[in-house]
A protein has these predicted regions:
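ATP-binding N-terminal substructure of ATP-dependent carboxylate-amine bond-forming enzymes
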Residues: 1-133, 168-171
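Active-site nucleotide/adenylate-binding loops and adjacent lid/helix of ATP-dependent enzymes
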Residues: 2, 138-223, 230, 242-243, ...
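ATP-dependent carboxylate activation and anion-phosphoryl transfer catalytic cores
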Residues: 7-10, 15-21, 26-28, 35, ...
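Short glycine-enriched loops at secondary-structure junctions
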Residues: 67-70, 113-115, 136, 244-245, ...
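Short, charged, surface-exposed secondary-structure boundary motifs
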Residues: 74-76, 92-94, 139-145, 193, ...
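Conserved hydrophobic "DFG−1" position in protein kinase catalytic cores
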Residues: 198, 227, 238, 304-306
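ATP-dependent carboxylate/phosphate-activation module, predominantly the ATP-grasp catalytic core
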Residues: 203, 207, 226-233, 237-294, ...
Length: 384
């Protein structure tokens, strides 16, 4: 029912399925070890993965969910949920601050780049450290073209990409890649592979960009065009504390959802991935984070693809949030990375036996309307 505040509505969910807790949980005294987490986009798949990872912590944290979508939030796994304004509204932060005060929140986990940006820009309003990378880091990483130029200037491997100032620029950009055959066209901002596809000639690129301009309102100048990387796809997620990498895990993406529905054969959503040991990939990612910020704190996720001759190059970085589709794998490794993050954010640094990730092979299998499943390599043929 309405709380009396104009921007927020409180929903007390019953403990059912994966949920837990009662109203009495909110009256318990707060100790130094308690984690009281607010998870945004509650009810989404990304938030569900985060909440399941948080529930694996002992003692289990108190978990509050928030979402502006009153339908999606009905699927939330949190103990208590709030309907809040959209993150892009001026009332969003007021609502979050109200929840922080009401429920003694000491940890906020944003599950998308919009929330990471809003929290980053208003961090001084919060009564505790939001455990985010610097504002400048988040801004740089949310502009893929600016990040690409930043790394090129510092000798960190990235694909060659160029801004599309106008459709007339396309001929000149293609001329720079004469003989390469396939280029990668994408929007410089946004998530979920927005505006991204492979193109083989100027006409394809022009038609693709014009379609997004006319139907989705994305400006031509928001597109980039450059080197297509056909090799293996990696992500490296790491948690940092004052310039020290507490834990980093390398994951290889093996296959994707709905690859038959787009010409590139890839997407931003893996349905099969695995933990790997890739020293060169890890080194590049750690060097990249240190180049951006010499005293980083929080979570940073780096994506890479290999060139035709097998050299990894950074395609983008998501700073201040966990990747939506591999969180379950990060939590299922011998050291739960979400626990490392939550404890560091609330003042406790864990002892981690394998700070550069597990050497054991774990596979993450995901599909629509199915809970994600993690399987060790040794168990792949069990029961078959």
């Amino acid at each position: 029912m309405p709380s009396g505040d104009p921007w927020i509505r409180r929903i007390v969910t019953e403990a059912s399925g994966e949920g837990r807790g009662t109203e009495h949980d909110w009256l318990a005294p707060l100790t130094n070890q308690d984690i009281r987490a607010l998870v945004t986009r509650a009810g989404s798949g990304a938030s569900g993965n985060l909440i399941r990872a948080l529930r694996a912590i002992t003692p289990a944290p108190v978990i509050v969910g928030a979402n502006h979508d009153r339908f999606t939030i009905k699927s939330s796994l949190a103990d208590l949920n709030y309907v809040v304004p959209v993150p892009t509204s001026t009332e969003f932060v007021d609502a979050v601050l109200d929840i922080v005060e009401r429920d003694r929140i000491n940890l906020i986990i944003g599950s998308d780049e919009n929330v990471a940006k809003v929290l980053s820009d208003t961090r001084e309003r919060f009564p505790f450290d939001l455990f985010l990378p610097r504002r400048e880091t988040i801004d740089l990483c949310q502009d893929k073209q600016a990040l690409n130029v930043f790394f090129r200037d510092r000798g960190i491997p990235v694909p060659r990409f160029y801004e599309v100032g106008s459709l007339d620029d396309l001929d000149g950009i293609f001329a720079r890649f004469e003989g390469d055959g396939v280029l990668w066209c994408r929007a410089r901002r946004g998530s979920g592979s927005v505006g991204a596809t492979a193109v083989t000639n100027v006409d394809q690129a022009r038609s693709w960009i014009a379609q997004w301009r006319d139907l989705r309102g994305i400006k031509v100048s928001d597109f980039t065009l450059g080197e297509f990387l056909p090799g293996r796809h990696y992500t490296v997620t790491s948690v940092w504390y004052r310039g020290q990498a507490l834990l980093a895990q390398t994951i290889e993406i093996l296959s994707y959802f709905a690859v038959g529905n787009n010409p590139s054969g890839t997407s931003s959503m893996p349905n099969l991935s695995k933990t790997v040991v890739a020293p060169e990939v890890l080194r590049i990612c750690l060097d990249a984070v240190r180049a951006i910020e010499d005293c980083a704190s929080g979570v940073i996720n780096v994506e890479l693809k290999e060139t035709l001759d097998g050299h990894p190059a950074i395609t983008e970085i998501n700073a201040g949030r966990f990747p939506a589709c591999t969180t379950t794998l990060l939590a299922a490794c011998p050291t739960n990375m979400i626990e490392v993050f939550a404890r560091a954010a609330t003042g406790e640094i864990m002892a981690i036996p394998e700070p550069h990730g597990t050497a054991q092979e774990h596979y993450l299998v995901q599909d629509i309307d199915c809970l994600p499943r993690v399987i060790t390599a040794s168990a792949l043929l069990e029961g078959l």
